[in-house]
């Protein structure tokens, strides 16, 4: 059987206009930019803030537990976690092998206290940008993905 020739104009149109990956990444970049802009004066960016919040919530979790909670692969987590460690916002307690508990330091808690209003401003701007239906859709999809 002869293979059907691919119409690259159709493929490129579809990839540029309806590709779910590129569209969700575009939304993520715009939203991340909003949070980064608000958090920048505090010396932290959106992914670092989120990671710091997760570590605060898990209080003493290991790297693998934090990675699972943040849905991050080990190399990405290590890179982001290293920045938090270098800035003194988290500390790694003594433990066996890779099972060292990680906790937010006093400096990290002060940073969260200072940056929380900026995060709330970013939340409000993002809610306004996405609208009620957009926010509901994002939250619904995120909740559904979390259970998979």
Please place each PLM-identified region on the residue numbering:
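The alpha-helix within a helix-turn-helix
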Residues: 67
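Short capping segments at the starts of secondary-structure elements
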Residues: 58-62
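Short alpha-helical "packing" element that flanks the helix-turn-helix/winged-helix DNA-binding module
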Residues: 48-52
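N-terminal leader segment of winged-helix/HTH proteins
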Residues: 1-42, 110, 140, 144-147
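Charged, amphipathic alpha-helical coiled-coil/dimerization segments
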Residues: 64, 82-140
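Short, locally clustered residues in the helix-turn-helix/winged-helix DNA-binding domain
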Residues: 25, 53-57, 116, 143
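Alpha-helical linker/hinge and terminal dimerization helices associated
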Residues: 27, 31-34, 70, 111, ...
């Amino acid at each position: 059987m002869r293979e059907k020739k691919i119409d690259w104009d159709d493929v490129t149109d579809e990839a540029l206009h309806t590709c779910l990956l590129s569209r969700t990444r575009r939304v993520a970049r715009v939203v991340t930019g909003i949070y980064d802009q608000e958090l920048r004066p505090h010396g932290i960016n959106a992914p670092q803030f989120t990671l710091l919040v997760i570590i605060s919530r898990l209080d003493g979790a290991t790297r693998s537990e934090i990675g699972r909670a943040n849905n991050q692969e080990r190399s990405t987590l290590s890179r982001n976690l290293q920045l938090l460690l270098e800035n003194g916002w988290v500390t790694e307690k003594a433990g066996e092998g890779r099972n060292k508990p990680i906790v937010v330091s006093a400096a990290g808690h002060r940073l969260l206290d200072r940056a929380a209003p900026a995060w709330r401003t970013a939340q409000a701007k993002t809610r306004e940008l996405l609208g009620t239906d957009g926010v509901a859709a994002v939250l619904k999809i995120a909740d559904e993905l979390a259970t998979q």
